[in-house]
Each structure stands twice: as structure tokens, then as C-alpha cells.
Amino acid sequence: MGRKVTVATCALNQWALDFEGNLQRILKSIEIAKHRGARYRLGPELEICGYGCWDHYYESDTLLHSLQVLAALLESPVTQDIICDVGMPVMHRNVRYNCRVIFLNRKILLIRPKMALANEGNYRELRWFTPWSRSRQTEEYFLPRMLQDLTKQETVPFGDAVLSTWDTCIGSEVCEELWTPHSPHVDMGLDGVEIFTNASGSHHVLRKAHARVDLVTMATTKNGGIYLLANQKGCDGDRLYYDGCALIAMNGSIFAQGSQFSLDDVEVLTATLDLEDIRSYRAEISSRNLAASRVSPYPRVKVDFALSCHEDLLEPVSEPIEWKYHSPAEEISLGPACWLWDFLRRSRQAGFFLPLSGGVDSAATACLVYSMCHQVCEAVKRGNLEVLADVRTIVNQLSYTPQDPRELCGRVLTTCYMASENSSQETCDRARELAQQIGSHHIGLHIDPVVKALVGLFSLVTGASPRFAVHGGSDRENLALQNVQARVRMVIAYLFAQLSLWSRGAPGGLLVLGSANVDESLLGYLTKYDCSSADINPIGGISKTDLRAFVQLCVERFQLPALQSILAAPATAELEPLAHGRVSQTDEEDMGMTYAELSVYGRLRKVAKTGPYSMFCKLLDMWRDTCSPRQVADKVKCFFSKYSMNRHKMTTLTPAYHAESYSPDDNRFDLRPFLYNTRWPWQFRCIENQVLQLEGRQRQELDGVD
């Protein structure tokens, strides 16, 4: 009797609107799955067009080209004798749906629309799609003529149904549906579905993998069954990095784990599992069986096909494994580095240009490029021909093979220390030493002539000469003189990014990298249109605390001792005059708060969704052992005053890798006004009234003691 099934899931590095490339990656994944004996192949959400099409979903071209790719898949001999489950947008009765299209041997078995759409954080699915709200119901979908000619079908089932093969029952849920309070797999499992599939478009956030794995294992622990999860991987066109983690689970255990970060465009997981293990597991869960007797049945699409074969007694089954998680520092070293690689190769540029200041943030960005070079070299050594072809295109040398990460880094990364009269020798030395250790092409230059020319122009026109505060100038003069240095550096960065390879006789341009962290962006502790303005920023969604942990990891993993002195030095912008040759300005003094405090404010503001008064109330409890109510009030007022004053800077912020749940990214993750009443009169008055009450109560208690 046939009872062992081999199933496949995958993680694909799809690219929004790259229909040709997406088709080839889908076909390759199906080919690998068949070669490994799989009879069912699951792919990521919206894999045909790529998940991140955004407003291109409105365009009829996106629907048309998706249908054309589906036709090519139906027609390909690669897709024969295996059930293929692919994702694409489908219009049904003039309504757009996010769908799974499941087919076998040129016949479409079912079009299953997504029932719960992701619409929080970075997700905006309700903007483009409508959820299918008719649970356990199907309609006829009239196929376009291009598909009718191929399938010889006029209509196919469209809606919430399951597949019934000769040997088992298969049900689909799509990404967000796994995260809902009452996921479809619950009732499907009670109705006898044994194999659950989940096609995801789930992006990376630090520390998120645990939640994803826990949801899958818990689903199969409570109800039994096989669970396949597919996901997109890589950068498909914007700030998000989809982090793979395809998996196969059964009865609460993991049987196959895909990589979370990888340069492989196609990764296929297969597992051979025994259906009888599901049936025996479910048999002794009496609560599940009682609930199953009352569940409403799903429409079943009968499939003349089996996932198992008759002679499978000698077929070895897969063994359970322990899921291996990355630490947050490891996630940072891998995720943004893979994102940089995708951005570099797909933008068809020749490398990166990074202003290297000698501080932690720009050092972390340099280390991410170095980590990228490590991953490229490892992929080439493993025989990844796609990565080798891409790196040869980037360096413009068809016979090139990278020898080691340092040698490759010298070809793709140009670093530049832009000194001013306010720069210290220590930061200059630290930047140079790090550049030597990672192998980047390093440039040192002085910006003073340009700064003096600009300030001189202002003085010539106005007759006024601004001075730094230490020389008797006002706060306005002091800030303006700092900002002109920062903005000059941005202009110089773009000039050198465009022409530095030209000056060396090499073709191509460089992508300018920014290095402002998420905490500084939240507070607005950066100059608008300075070195925070770049083409992309790989650390813009990462906290200072996590960045320091990542840099410490690089000291050990990549043997970069220069990072030790960078970690030990106080963070400074070096925009004000030195005191006796030493740094007189530190970031935390300028901000009026520590980076640790900023992370707390950020999480409370975005994740806990607190305004000034609610944040004050929460911090009263959190900081009761270290701060008085008056101190807490002053800190909260300081944060919200500076945050609202600088909120306008977020509207022009460089696109940054999304990694943190409290990111202030203005693109679509954190939508706020950028013109505030920065005095917050009503909110601050509520805080002040509460402080006065608490102080009065404390005085009464002290008087009572006396």
C-alpha cells in the first residue's frame, strides 16, 4: 500500500516584474523537485510577478504577463507528472485577488484566492487585492482564451476548496493566514486535510524567525499533519529582504530547514514522510476528533493522481531535525549583506562608495560589504555559477574568479575619509587601519578648502561671518557651520562615486552607501542632505546597540582588530572645533540622551503605540528604580520635542534595509505628519499635572513620617 509521500517546497530570489527571470527560477525549482522524487511542489507567494510589485498590481500588464508565464509553465515538459502550486494575481469578475494556481499535467485543478490579507507594517495588500470572504465556497472561473487553448478547459474552480488525491488531502493557506487568530489549517485539519501548504512573502525582521517556526510547529502539534512553507528570498526591488526559511514540518517536528540568508537564487527542500504517522498521531487526540465530527466540510477537488507509489516499503523516510537559529548579530552580518549583493548586481553598478569616518556606524557598513564579499567567495567555491557570472559582470572581467574576500573587497568597495580641521588624528587612523584590513580602495582628502569657499561666499554676499560657539558664535551659527561640513561631504561622495573608477581607467559607477542608524533617524540626529543621504543605507533599520554587537562579532569572525579601537571610542560627529587636539563633541551629549534610552523610546512609540502621556506612564514603572517622576517627564518631553522637530528629515531619508520593528521609515512603515506643534501643549500639560500629583503625594508621605 502506498503511504510515503515526497513533497517539495522552495525559496526563490524573485524580482518584481522580472517575468523572464522569475519563470526560469520557477522552472528550475520544479526540475530539482522532480529530480528528488517529489510529486508536489510549492512556491512562494506571488512568485510569478514577484511580491513587491506594489502599485504595478493595478496595471493590466501585470495580470497579462502573469497569465503568459502561467501558460509557459503549463506548456513546459518540466511541469509534467508533478502537482505545481504557483502564486500570481488573478482578476475574477473584475476583482483582483492574490491567488494560488494549482495545476497538474496541463490542467488547472484549483485557483485558491487569499482570504486574509496582510495590511500592517510594510504590507499594503488591501490596497491592491480583495480578500476572498466566502469560506468553503467556490465559483466557476472562466479561463482566458490563451489558457483554454492549452488546458482544453473553459472553467476551473475558484475559491476556498481542498484537493483530494488518491492517497491524501491537500489544503492551502497563504502567508498571513498562518498568523491570524483562526487559521484555515485548523478547520482543514479537522476536515481530514493531511498536507497543509503555505506560500509566503515574509520579510526579514531581527528576531522574527522564532515566531514563524513556532507557528508552524504549533499548528502541526495541535492537529497533526504535514506543513510545507515556501518563502521568497532576497531583495526584489526595495527596502525589504525576504529571508527564505522554507521548511517542512510534521506532527510538531521539523524535517527540513531552508537557509535564512543565502546567495542561491533557487533553494529546494524535499522530505519523504509517512502519511500513516499523521493518522496514528491524530487517532489519540480525542479533543481533535470530537471537534472534527462537528466541522463543516470543505469542497473537494478530486485529483486523478497520487503523491505516493505502491512499492514504497523500502523508501527511507526523513528524520526530524533541530532548527538552527542565528543570533541577532549573525542576522545583521548576513541579511543586509545579501541585500547589498542583490542591489549591486541588479542595479548593474560596479561597486560601492562609502564615506568612512572612523566611527562605529560607517565601520559597520564597511563590515557588511566585507561580509558580502565573504558570502560571494563562499558561493563561488561551492560552485554557484550564477554568483560567479554576476561578480564577473560587476568587475568587468569575464575570466575573473575571486580569490578571497579581501581581494574582492578591493575591487568593489571604495572608502573615503573626508577630514576637516575639526577631525582628529585618531579617527583618521582608525578609518585607514580598517580599510587596510578589509582591503578596500581607500582615499583620504580634506574638505576645508570647499567649506571655506562656501562660508566665504556667504560672508561676501551678506557681510556677516558666522563663528562656532566655542569662538563666541550663537547656536544658529554653530549649527550652520556644522551642517555645511556635513553637506559638502555628500556632494563630494557623489562626485567620487561617479568618477573615481573613471580616474583609474575602469568603467562604471559606484553606489553611495549611507550609515545612519535607526536610533539617530528616529531622533533626527543627522543633517538633512549630508552623508546620511545616499543611494542605499544597509544599517538604517538597525539600532546602535545591535550594531555594536555586530561589529564585535566581526572582530572575531573576520579577524579585524582595527574594530576594537573603533568600539572603544566615544561616538562623535567631529563637526565642532577640537579641544587641544582632542574630540570635544560626543553624540550622546549632543542628543541629550543615550542610545539605550533612544531604543526604549523607539519601541514604546512604534511597537507599544504610545504618545507622550502613555510613554511617560510606562516609563514611570520601567525606570522607577533609577529616575524620579520629574526626571522621567523631562526625558519624555525632550524626546518628543526633538522627534517632532526633526520629523521632516524622515521624508527624504535614504532607502534603508528594514530590520527593526520600531523603524521610523516614512516610506510606508511609519506614516506620520512632518509638521507638528513641537510644544505638545496639551500632552505635556497632562504629564506635568501627573508629576505634580505624584510629587504632592510624596511630600505628604514624607510629612507623615516626620
UniProtKB/Swiss-Prot annotation:
Instruction: Reply yes or no: does the keyword Cytoplasm apply.
Output: no
Gene Ontology cellular-component terms for this entry are: cytoplasm
* Gene Ontology molecular function: any one: ATP binding
Stretch list, region Ligase: 325-706
Pathway annotation from the record: Cofactor biosynthesis; NAD(+) biosynthesis; NAD(+) from deamido-NAD(+) (L-Gln route): step 1/1
Membrane-crossing residue ranges in chain numbering: none
InterPro entries associated with the record: C-N_Hydrolase, C-N_Hydrolase_sf, Gln-dep_NAD_synthase, NAD/GMP_synthase, NAD_synthase, Rossmann-like_a/b/a_fold
Q: Which family does it belong to?
A: In the C-terminal section; belongs to the NAD synthetase family.
User: Could you tell me what this protein is called?
Assistant: Glutamine-dependent NAD(+) synthetase
| Gene source species | Bos taurus
